[in-house]
């Protein structure tokens, strides 16, 4: 008899930005064959692409990451990803117009860039532009329907926008996708919203 091992799921970062971690790779030539050599590599900093170097600096909260992302954009290296991560940096600095510009430039490069839609939605929610937050959360759900944070954040946005029935349905979808640890929190929120409707 086989034993199912459940791996721990990291709690979602609700209303938090989602940095692009690595460049998107082209699909493998043979999708039925596993790549056995995707593990760790020892690399030297000067061997990194401009985007990877910027990401490494960004993940270590190095202020020079911003300049390195701009260098990656100039070199044409992961342009959409670089603009997206620049948008996060600008958001953290509360430079909201610059952040919006970065996210939209990312979407100009790749209109289906999930992280840019998700992060733009978080930014619009933060500055209380709920209609635009709603649209970008909905778009992020279309692009990645299994990412639970989009549902949770959309549910909160709908609730703040007085769309309680839609908020409850969206939070129920979040509950379906979320780990068991998250159920209590979302159940309490759903119960509160249900009572508010009555």
Region roles according to the model:
Residues 75, 109, 143, 177-178:
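Structural marker of alpha-solenoid helical repeat scaffolds
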Residues 47, 80-81, 114-115, 148-149, ...:
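Helix-start (N-cap) detector for alpha-helical repeat units in TPR-like alpha-solenoids
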Residues 1-48:
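Long, contiguous interaction/recruitment modules in multidomain scaffold/adaptor proteins
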């Amino acid at each position: 008899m086989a034993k199912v091992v459940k791996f721990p799921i990291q709690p979602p970062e609700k209303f938090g930005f989602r940095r692009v971690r690595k460049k998107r790779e082209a699909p493998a030539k043979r999708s039925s064959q596993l790549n056995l050599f995707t593990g760790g590599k020892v690399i030297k900093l000067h061997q990194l692409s401009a985007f990877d170097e910027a990401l490494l600096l960004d993940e270590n909260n190095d202020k020079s990451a911003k300049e390195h992302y701009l260098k990656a954009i100039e070199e044409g290296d992961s342009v959409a990803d670089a603009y997206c991560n620049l948008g996060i940096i600008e958001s953290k600095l509360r430079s909201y117009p610059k952040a919006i510009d970065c996210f939209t430039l990312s979407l100009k490069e790749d209109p289906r860039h999930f992280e840019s839609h998700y992060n733009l939605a978080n930014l619009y929610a933060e500055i209380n532009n709920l209609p635009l937050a709603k649209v970008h959360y909905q778009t992020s759900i279309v692009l990645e329907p299994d990412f639970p944070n989009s549902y949770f954040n959309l549910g909160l946005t709908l609730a703040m926008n007085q769309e309680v029935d839609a908020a409850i349905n969206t939070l129920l979808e979040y509950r379906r996708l979320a780990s068991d640890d998250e159920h209590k929190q979302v159940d309490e929120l759903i119960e509160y919203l249900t009572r508010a409707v009555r």
